[in-house]
């Protein structure tokens, strides 16, 4: 193991390294950052560390060869590598949407937009709604929920008449919480992920239109095993005229890009 890529984000630390010709990807809570570094030092005392991310300066790597890679550069290089490896390269220039604790939007190696809506909202507000702090459990609850019991839908407004717009659209996020007594924590989590997805998509779609592309690549730790969020992005493709691409290891794009960067 000669090079180790580390992406130290707001909530998670992602690690990428190659050993015996195989790439290994690991994810840890930022609270365990010091433990992770000690483990890596023991695992490969002669490796060079290629670090990126907003919390990279907190890494205690004194005495080791350390190279700091600009976060945007690492993310773009890692994404390009994964698109080729997974054979998902779009046919034209693409918008890159990185959904981590917050969300950043890139085009041609430039950050052109962003929002505080992302994984931090999912886990933070999710815990307030459900008293559950586990990301995995929150996603599982969302899978079991029915967001139409929490969200006021267009069809709820036009019950006895023809709707002028698609009746399956959201009229008001969480607009039915006080109206439907059967509304559950699972339903609220499903509604929360819908809100996050719709908000990110509206911003991303506007950014895509501004640079005249219909190709949007979604990456980031918040998409990991998060089928409900992916479904939001897939659902509106035809209606809003864009193509969504997801990467199996997109949550590690920054760590991979850092490892590969010279």
Curated annotation (Swiss-Prot):
Question: Into which family does the record put it?
Answer: Belongs to the type II pantothenate kinase family.
Extract the CDD domains matched here.
ASKHA_NBD_PanK-II_bac
Give the E.C. number(s). Answer: 2.7.1.33
What's the protein name? Answer: Type II pantothenate kinase
Query: What is the uppermost EC class here?
Result: transferase
- Give the active-site positions: 71
Where in the cell does this protein reside?
Cytoplasm
Query: What does this protein's UniProt record list under function?
Result: Catalyzes the phosphorylation of pantothenate (Pan), the first step in CoA biosynthesis.
The chemistry this enzyme catalyses reads: (R)-pantothenate + ATP = (R)-4'-phosphopantothenate + ADP + H(+)
Molecular-function GO terms, alphabetical: ATP binding; pantothenate kinase activity
- The entry's ATP-binding residues are 7-14, 101, 119-123, 135
Q: Which Pfam families match?
A: Fumble
Q: In which pathway does it act?
A: Cofactor biosynthesis; coenzyme A biosynthesis; CoA from (R)-pantothenate: step 1/5
The keyword Plastid belongs to this UniProt entry's keyword annotation: no
The record's gene field reads coaW
Question: What InterPro entries would the database entry show?
Answer: ATPase_NBD (IPR043129), Type_II_PanK (IPR004567), Type_II_PanK_bac (IPR011602)
GO biological process per UniProt? coenzyme A biosynthetic process
Name the GO cellular-component terms.
Answer: cytosol
Which residue spans adopt a coiled-coil conformation according to this UniProt entry? none
């Amino acid at each position: 193991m000669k090079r180790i890529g580390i992406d130290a984000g707001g909530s998670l630390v992602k690690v990428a390294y190659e050993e015996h010709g195989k790439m290994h990807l690991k994810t840890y809570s930022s609270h365990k950052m010091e433990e992770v570094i000690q483990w890596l030092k023991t695992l490969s005392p002669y490796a060079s560390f290629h670090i990126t991310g907003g919390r990279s300066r907190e890494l205690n790597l004194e005495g080791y060869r350390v190279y700091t890679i600009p976060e945007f550069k690492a993310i773009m290089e890692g994404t390009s590598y994964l698109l080729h490896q997974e054979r998902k390269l779009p046919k034209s220039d693409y918008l890159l949407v990185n959904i981590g604790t917050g969300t950043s939007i890139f085009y041609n190696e430039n950050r052109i937009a962003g929002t505080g809506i992302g994984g931090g909202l999912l886990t933070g507000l999710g815990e307030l709604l459900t008293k559950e702090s586990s990301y995995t459990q929150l996603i599982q609850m969302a899978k079991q929920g029915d967001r139409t019991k929490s969200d006021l839908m267009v069809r709820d407004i036009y019950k006895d008449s023809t709707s002028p717009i698609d009746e399956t659209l959201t009229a008001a996020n969480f607009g039915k919480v006080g109206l439907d007594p059967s509304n559950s924590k699972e339903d609220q989590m499903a509604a929360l992920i819908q809100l996050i997805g719709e908000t990110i998509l509206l911003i991303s779609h506007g950014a895509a239109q501004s640079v005249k592309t219909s190709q949007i690549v979604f990456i980031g730790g918040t998409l990991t095993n998060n089928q409900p969020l992916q479904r939001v992005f897939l659902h509106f493709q035809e209606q809003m005229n864009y193509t969504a691409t997801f990467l199996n290891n997109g949550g590690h794009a920054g760590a991979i890009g850092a490892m590969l960067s010279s």
